[in-house]
Amino acid sequence: MSLRVIDKTPQGGQSTHSPHKRNPGFPLDLDWVERVRMNRSALERRAGSIGARRTVKKDYQLAWLLKAITLIDLTTLNADDTAGRVERLCAKARHPLRQDILDRLDVPELRILPGAVCVYHNFVKTAVTALEGTGIPVAAVSTAFPHGLAPLETKLREIELSVADGAQEIDIVIERGMVLRQDWQGLYDQIRAFRKACGDAHIKTILGTGELATQSNIAKASLVCMLAGADFIKTSTGKEKVNANLVTSLTMIRMIRWFAEETGIEIGYKPAGGISKAADALKYMALMKEELGNGWLQPHLFRFGASTLLTDIERQLEHGLTGHYAADYRQPMV
């Protein structure tokens, strides 16, 4: 398959917080999209094998958990969010582990920080100010999150305002109805417009996989978003009844692999919604390692969208060091 790049010099060029090459986008190849098929039973068998085949223990588990922290988008997306809550979340991002845990780990050379802090547009400026000097990017959910149902002009303006306020990553929401009625051209055109509005900011496309009916729909939507220029594909808003799971993740990861084989462009993956336990995070990391390789276990190619995962990771680290589990209140988020 031969694909030509739409923009030889992609708008925005390199990210300000990652040397990773941006996805410039490619023409919509409907023949490729229509060839996509997914076998759900095979996906379920493969996903079911991950936990049993990839277990890490003792010091290795501690190392994997430290890596997991660097892959988290610390998130607060609640209707009752306040500037104070966002500031407290950013304070946690600056110091994600208690000092006594860091001292016991004895890894002073490691700078353990989360991948980003993710907030609503109204709090982008607050987060940018609170994170100044850390190198931690601010991600803003956008385009009428979580439903994605608003006039195109409104959604584009929301992106532009978040970028102007300092967001370096924009998590946009696709219109699920476009996937359900197979309107691939419409979906492609919207993502291209969103990509242009993002400028230098990386664009993550939220599929809302729990509302797309089939794994084949999820795979096709993933491909269309990547062809349109998405830097990341993301499972969910966290507001759906069904959020991230290993089966859907395997579908999306294999589309990322296929896309990389055909285009040479590496796309990031972000599972989100319901990932609150360290053991679950390790399964997703094992899946990424087995399907895409160690190179994808980096913040510019893999993130967890999570609001409480860090709390359990801290508990597991403390248990690994002391043999005792601490109460959640010893690892407060905000």
Tell what function each PLM region has.
Residues D59-I69, D80-I112, H121-K270, S276-S307, ...:
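Alpha/beta enzyme core
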